[in-house]
Amino acid sequence: MYTRRRLFLGLMAAGLLPAQDSQPTLQVTGAVKQALTLSADDLAKMPRATVKTTSGGMETLYDGVWLHEVLKKAGVPLGSELRGKALSSYVIAEAQDGYQVVFSLGELDPSFIDNEILLADTANGKPLFGAQGRFRLVVPKDKPGARSIRMLTKIEVVQVRK
């Protein structure tokens, strides 16, 4: 065991194994006009929002950016542009461990539905970390919390019809 650790540390020092990212990022890809790679610093420069959730009797205040604002920044059609072929688009949110959840593009547009989804980077005033990951989605109106995905690393926009 001790030998393995020394080998691992030696390979890292030699640059043969990558060190962990010091600045986690979120990729926004797929059917977008401009693919994005966002850091916590990038999100901090965008308009902020707060959502309060209750789970297991505990309240949490999440702070972040509305997901539709991130999609808008990537050039995804929303608002009056979300019609016709664009309505057949959906979004896959993917976590670091491969867990995925899906939203129709209409579900993410506040002009279609009153269920804004938060891309959170802080909870109760502190940056998310550890098991939460650096980014997570908070879906306050979903009854089960299964789509409030944590450890978020990628958002992919997919168009069903070509």
Q: Model-found features: residue ranges?
A:
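N-terminal secretory signal peptides and thylakoid transit peptides that target proteins
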Residues: 1-12
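N-terminal intrinsically disordered, low-complexity segments enriched in P/E/S/T
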Residues: 2, 20-162
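Hydrophobic h-region of N-terminal signal peptides that target proteins for export
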Residues: 10-20
